[in-house]
């Protein structure tokens, strides 16, 4: 915020006017496109100038549960799509970007800050932050993205009729299709290891889906529940000799520490299949899933309707991404002692080889 220096003696009128102009100009700041770490600090940055047709500057609070490539891609996709449609950062939109650093208490504090600031919209990236936002306010429109099952998370009444002040986009995975990739890589695979955060609804849903899908495919799931990212490597090591492959779902805690899983997998030559493409780019062998950048863009399209007064969250069905794509990592396969089938390479939308 600007601080005003009160004049204690008479100055020429022209000098006084010029001083005010300089103070105003110096007070304008740009909002960073990277979220602030941990608990919220300060206020949203002031726009650098420019207004929409109605002369309004919008305040949008953005909070993600933790920083990792998939969630970051959703955030950047949202901001870019908003700008393409006339809602530009530092012109007519102020973004307050925050990261809860994996802590629900931080997520609640951040949501309370957004409420106190009178934000026009909250973008909650991942299930815990969406739950924190809804717990905090029933008035400010909330859009979520990267939420696997918003009904199970008690965010919406139904996918078709959310009700209340919350809606958004889901990143529900085609879990069965992803597990089929394991069989394609290793036809004799019978046991699949899954590490997940026991405190995240999103993760529990995916583990249950994996169990059901594995049963259909003649495999079993060996699960290891964790409560901290520091436990990921130990959990992976505990499965060595017991599993034929690892499956890493879109669990925010595990994905943020996927390097720990990959270290064990590479040393023990255990293939890793992931729930999203950024994990493949980090070193998993393959995934069949969504593009988080495009999911963010899709969420922005919903935000545009809300901010323009064309729709309300209660009446906007939760949306999902229609197109899935196969992404494979040849280098990762080599490190884990796996030869990628030519059929898989031929149908892949993207092949990473460096």
Model-identified regions with their sequence ranges:
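Structural motif
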Residues: 94-116, 224-239
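Extracytoplasmic "Venus flytrap"
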Residues: 47, 55-85, 96-105, 199-203, ...
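Bacterial signal peptide processing site
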Residues: 27-30
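Beta-alpha junction/loop-to-helix N-cap segments that form part of ligand/metal-binding clefts
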Residues: 100-157, 248-266, 270, 275
């Amino acid at each position: 915020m600007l601080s005003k220096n009160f004049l204690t003696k008479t100055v020429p009128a022209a000098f006084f006017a010029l001083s005010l102009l300089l103070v105003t100009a110096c007070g304008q700041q740009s909002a960073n496109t990277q979220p602030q770490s941990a608990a919220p600090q300060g206020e949203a940055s002031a726009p650098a100038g420019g207004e929409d047709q109605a002369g309004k500057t919008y305040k949008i609070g953005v909070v993600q549960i933790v920083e990792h490539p998939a969630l970051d891609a959703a955030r950047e996709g949202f901001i870019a799509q908003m700008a393409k449609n006339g809602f530009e950062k530092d012109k007519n939109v102020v973004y307050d970007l925050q990261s809860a650093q994996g802590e629900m208490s931080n997520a609640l504090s951040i949501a309370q800050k957004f409420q106190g600031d009178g934000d026009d919209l909250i973008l909650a990236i991942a299930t815990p932050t969406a739950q924190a936002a809804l717990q905090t306010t029933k008035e400010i429109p909330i859009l979520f993205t990267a939420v696997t099952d918003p009904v199970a998370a008690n965010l919406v009444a139904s996918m078709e009729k959310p009700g209340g002040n919350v809606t958004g986009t889901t990143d529900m995975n085609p879990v069965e299709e992803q597990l089929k990739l394991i069989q394609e890589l290793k036809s004799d695979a019978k046991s699949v290891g899954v590490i997940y955060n026991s405190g995240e609804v999103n993760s529990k849903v995916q583990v249950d889906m994996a169990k059901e899908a594995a049963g259909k495919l003649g495999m079993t799931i060996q699960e290891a529940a964790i409560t901290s990212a520091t436990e990921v490597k130990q959990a992976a090591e505990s499965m060595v000799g017991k599993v034929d492959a690892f499956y890493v779902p879109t669990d925010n805690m595990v994905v943020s520490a996927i390097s720990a899983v990959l270290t064990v997998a590479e040393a023990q030559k255990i293939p890793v299949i992931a729930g999203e493409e950024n994990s493949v780019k980090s070193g998993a062998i393959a995934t069949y899933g969504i593009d988080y950048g495009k999911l963010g863009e899709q969420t922005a399209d919903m935000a545009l309707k809300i901010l323009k007064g064309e729709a309300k969250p209660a009446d906007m069905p939760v949306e999902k991404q229609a197109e899935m794509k196969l992404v494979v990592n040849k280098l990762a396969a080599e490190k884990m002692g796996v030869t990628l089938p030519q059929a898989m390479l031929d149908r892949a939308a993207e092949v990473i080889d460096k």
